[in-house]
Amino acid sequence: MNEQYSAMRSNVSMLGTLLGDTIKEALGENILDKVETIRKLSKSSRAGNEKHRQELLTTLQNLSNDELLPVARAFSQFLNLTNTAEQYHTISPHGEAASNPAQLSSAFKRLKESKDLSERDIRDAVESLSIELVLTAHPTEITRRTLIHKLVEVNTCLKQLDHNDLADYERNQVMRRLRQLIAQSWHTDEIRKIRPTPVDEAKWGFAVVENSLWEGVPAFLRELDEQLEQAFGYRLPVDAVPVRFTSWMGGDRDGNPNVTAEVTRHVLLLSRWKAADLFLRDIQVLVSELSMSECTPELLELAGGSEVQEPYRAIMKSLRSQLSCTLSYLEARLTGEERLPPKDLLITNEQLWEPLHACYQSLKTCGMGIIADGSLLDTLRRVRCFGVPLVRIDVRQESTRHTDALAEITRYLGLGDYESWSESDKQAFLIRELSSKRPLLPRYWEPSADTKEVLDTCRVIAKAPQGSIAAYVISMARTPSDVLAVQLLLKEAGCPFALPVAPLFETLDDLNNADDVMTQLLSIDWYRGFIQGKQMVMIGYSDSAKDAGVMAASWAQYRAQDALIKTCEKAGIALTLFHGRGGSIGRGGAPAHAALLSQPPGSLKGGLRVTEQGEMIRFKYGLPDVTISSLALYTGAILEANLLPPPEPKQEWHEVMDELSRVSCDMYRGYVRENPDFVPYFRAATPELELGKLPLGSRPAKRRPNGGVESLRAIPWIFAWTQNRLMLPAWLGAGAGLQKVVDDGKQEQLEEMCRNWPFFSTRIGMLEMVFAKADLWLAEYYDQRLVEEKLWPLGKQLRDQLAADINIVLAISNDDHLMADLPWIAESIALRNVYTDPLNVLQAELLHRSRQQKQPDADLELALMVTIAGVAAGMRNTG
């Protein structure tokens, strides 16, 4: 690991030097000297030199308005380069060794060594493996796409420089290219000027597929095949592709009025168009590769009979023309042209799969397996993973929108006001209508705009090719009628297939009631018949943590999952738990392996379905090599969790967690909800108000424009606290709960839980990571610069609580310093802190100056946005 780190540090240093050269050329020696001085002071300040810390503050406070932007940009760009070097040096964003086949082989080794498992058990588990990653356009991806492309190329250059046999002139060429890329980045605006539309976000998602996943998924499956063959002498069946991708971009309308039925329809077409484009490129390659003439009689017939000289090519050429026709038809539809579909329009995956698979079988039969297992196998696997839709779409909408639509319908029909009915009356009405053969909607009725939008969305789903919509997610689901309402609206729209409808339980109360709601639903005969033994439930991480604090929320999530697993098992229902976690700790983010192994036993039987958000998509899937690593991690963790599940926690551990949860929730809510100074303090001490100006995602930052903390979305809430380094949502309440349990004489029990219960040890590990990124002196500096004096005592109270929390966590984990068991994460945070600290100080300074201004100052605002983007890069998991 040390060797790896010294290699990374030398690359970071080289990239820093090149950035320095660029700055010097662009702005002259003076600015570069200033940046260098600040960097050295920051390094010394980090090492504990108080005099240099004061000097650092003075230097940054004394920068003129003209100097603020270049200095902020220098540190922000340096952090992007550091992250790129770190990603290259096989240390992935969470300190998990990336791109390392050993991950899979060590997982297989552990499985083989287990006395209770037969090879058949392992094989069955591999073949039923299901990983569905749901890409969401969260506004935490701060880096512009144009800069991401340049950073990917920087990564490629680092790879080339690692070759020992490079000739001098080749090394010089690579260095010249690096200089060009760094100069291009420096002269590019890093801040978007215009907020992206939902269609822009969807295109960003397709770019991730095209630039990384298209190569990365088949490469991962080849890796998996090799490891399986080495361990068990067996390869995956051709049609077994354990990885799928779904997207919320263009489908998630919860609180986002910009995502309309028309946008969803457009994104579905765009997705099919991109898939046809990518498959056409694959087929072009196969046309040139598959020049063989020997084939089976079945294939010859498929190719057109005995006259055909090159049967494989003939089939590929026919596919090529089918894809070309599909592409031009979809292009016409996207530009609004009404055109009759061609007779061989590609609509289903089978249309692609059958001819390709026939070629594969023929090559295998004729002794050309080595050819079959090349590009052709990769394409077959892409058909199974991406298929004709490329990525499937989830539609998400808030439960009250469905209630309002049905209330409008029942009022119009003279049946009363659905919204005011009791839950049992709602259920009786919904089941009656679901069982009825006549339509509910009157023919010539004109609904209100909001209701029309809900109904139009259901019609888009009904008309979409089967397989292009993955699920309908209901946010803020609280009752069985919330689920039945969506089923009825889909029936009324003429939906010809049973779409999975997933209630999302996301506040503390909703999580605690989740099992009751699902038990009631599963007791309804109509519902049981309709779902045919399968149910998806989504667990919300971010809103529950914002509602109750991270410790109470994570325990409620665990208990809800555990209860749902047991209820569905008893009812004979296959449950898929869908995890809505973010990149940050306050939104459920954790190193993948630890997070999966810390879930209740049996939670991954129905496969893994999890959201991948914002900047985490780039860190985990931005490069094919890193994609291989991330998928290998998930695969190993799921197989272990299913085949070697963690033991059921002891009853007394449950009791400790109940107490911990109660104390931590009370403390968290005592500050966030009940302290009248809290919201004014939050608004002053963080850039929360300024964050609204960042053109990040297409979603508004608030559910209600004039509400308090509760109306803030979870992402800006966490993003704001990450910026001022107090990281409050990720720890507040947790330490107080732990302290109470220790005071009750149960420290030994906590230590035992830490050693023997993955759920608990992961919670403690996540707290340590947050504490390593939090910073008391910086949080205090924000208070001094930005908060009125009467609120200072609250800031001091919170910082004292943070210091106490750090001590109690160290006592329970028996360590002298944080992250003792994960030195590479500690190293990585330390490396970035030197560059993040000046950005934090600058940000506080800029907030101070911009809040003094009578008129907005465009230059100050731009510099502020750069510091926000830079701190986000330094903290890595922003929201």
Curated annotation (Swiss-Prot):
GO CC term, one of those recorded: cytosol
Co-factor(s): Mg(2+)
InterPro entries in the record: PEP_COase (IPR021135), PEP_COase_bac/pln-type (IPR022805), PEP_COase_Lys_AS (IPR018129), PEPCASE_His_AS (IPR033129), Pyrv/PenolPyrv_kinase-like_dom (IPR015813)
Active site per the UniProt annotation: H138, K546
Domain of life of the source: Bacteria
GO molecular function per UniProt: magnesium ion binding; phosphoenolpyruvate carboxylase activity
Annotated catalysed reactions: oxaloacetate + phosphate = phosphoenolpyruvate + hydrogencarbonate
GO annotation (BP), single: carbon fixation
Record's keyword terms, sorted: Carbon dioxide fixation, Lyase, Magnesium
EC number, UniProt record: 4.1.1.31
Family that this chain belongs to: Belongs to the PEPCase type 1 family.
Function field: Forms oxaloacetate, a four-carbon dicarboxylic acid source for the tricarboxylic acid cycle.
Protein name: Phosphoenolpyruvate carboxylase
